[in-house]
């Protein structure tokens, strides 16, 4: 019998759950709104009961709760979509329908009475305020108002690079756990894994080139992008080049920030892999490259999907198709860009097993 029976809310493709089975966790029920993401979840987690539909719909919510009760769910993981808090002001947060999704996590905690709850989101989430009982409170404050008699409520911002992931990706983590249990935070690793450690051995590729290595193929880039990035050194942005900078069709310079059209650094972790990680013009998206004898730089491209998989701590035997079209490649990148690196979620949750000496079933 599995020690944990988990409900995964707002699960997308379930990337954060990749290593759960390795530590004895069983996700028995999952819910995702978007059918394309739900289908991918079923591909990656065929043994989980995926209930596709809008959790705001009472029929869907009731089905999720009913199936969770049948399966004996004792843990909830929840990653509500965070787009609604990226650029809006405080009053707009209250009215953004996407932010109503947080309340369904609270409802599920009330209805299922789990022993553990794991909530993760963008760092800004911890400071965001909601209206609750005529007060403006953070989500953590609301959790304490509702559940502090039964649960310990804790939060931190953890960066994946501190826990063995070759990517700098800070995430807001909120934990709820019943007071008879322990759930410490994971300790930081002594060594940071760099891009040199992670992807140096992969062969160089230019625009449109394909290697014999699975998922190591370069998406095509424009001639202009290839030219400007081949004249941009490791760690630098083409926006600062005096001659070879991004241009519009009329020859004028493209407007952009200092971290656009920018190469990464070999001796640092990858910057955060966002959903647009295939775009040269995105933030810190370009391969570090290697200097050639003529002074130009190789790999004038974004990371290949294989490189994104590696820096996101996903396994190289991951269950996605071996061959992907460009559209499919970009969709998988989108899924990865939306997700917490799975090694980080594993290290956070396995602390329950370690701290309670794997005696969870006896408590």
Indicate where each model-derived feature is located.
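Beta-sheet entry/capping signal
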Residues: 27, 115-116, 270-272
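Core alpha/beta nucleotide-donor-binding catalytic domains of modification enzymes
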Residues: 2-112, 123-130, 134-136
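C-terminal target-recognition/interaction regions appended to catalytic cores
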Residues: 223-363
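Short alpha-helical patches at coil-to-helix transitions and adjacent helical residues
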Residues: 13, 136, 171, 338-346
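Hydrophobic alpha-helical packing residues
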Residues: 20, 146-148, 352
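Aromatic-acidic/polar surface patches that form glycan- and anion
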Residues: 9, 30, 163-167, 262, ...
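Class I S-adenosyl-L-methionine
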Residues: 63-70, 82-260
């Amino acid at each position: 019998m599995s020690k944990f029976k988990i409900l995964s809310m707002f699960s997308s493709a379930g990337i954060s759950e990749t290593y759960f089975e390795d530590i004895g966790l069983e996700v028995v029920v999952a819910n995702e709104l978007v059918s394309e993401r739900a289908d991918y979840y079923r591909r990656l987690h065929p043994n989980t009961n995926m209930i596709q539909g809008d959790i705001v719909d009472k029929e869907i919510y009731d089905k999720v709760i009913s199936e969770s009760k049948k399966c004996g769910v004792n843990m909830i993981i929840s990653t509500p979509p965070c787009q609604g808090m990226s650029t809006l002001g405080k009053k707009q947060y209250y009215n953004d329908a996407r932010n109503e999704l947080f309340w369904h996590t609270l409802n599920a905690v009330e209805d299922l009475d789990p022993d553990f709850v794991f909530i993760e989101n963008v760092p800004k989430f911890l400071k965001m305020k909601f209206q609750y009982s005529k007060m403006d409170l953070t989500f953590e404050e609301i959790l304490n108002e509702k559940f502090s008699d039964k649960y310990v409520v804790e939060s931190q911002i953890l960066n994946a690079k501190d826990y063995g992931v070759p990517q700098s990706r800070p995430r807001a983590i909120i934990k709820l756990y019943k007071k008879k249990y322990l759930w410490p935070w994971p300790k930081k690793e002594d060594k940071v894994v760099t891009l040199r450690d992670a992807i140096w051995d992969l062969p160089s590729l230019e625009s449109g080139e394909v290697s014999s290595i699975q998922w190591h193929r370069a998406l095509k880039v424009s001639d202009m992008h290839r030219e400007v990035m081949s004249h941009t050194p490791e760690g630098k942005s083409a926006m600062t080049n005096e001659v070879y900078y991004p241009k519009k069709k009329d020859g004028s310079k493209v407007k952009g920030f200092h971290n656009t059209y920018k190469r990464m650094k070999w001796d640092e972790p990858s910057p955060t892999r966002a959903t647009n990680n295939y775009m040269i013009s995105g933030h810190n998206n370009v391969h570090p490259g290697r200097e050639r004898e003529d002074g130009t730089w190789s790999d004038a491209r974004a990371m290949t999907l294989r490189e994104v998989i590696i820096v996101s701590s996903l396994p190289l035997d991951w269950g996605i198709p071996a061959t992907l079209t460009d559209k499919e490649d970009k969709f998988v990148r989108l899924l990865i860009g939306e997700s917490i690196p799975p090694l980080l979620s594993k290290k956070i949750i396995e602390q329950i097993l370690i701290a309670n000496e794997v005696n969870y079933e006896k408590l």
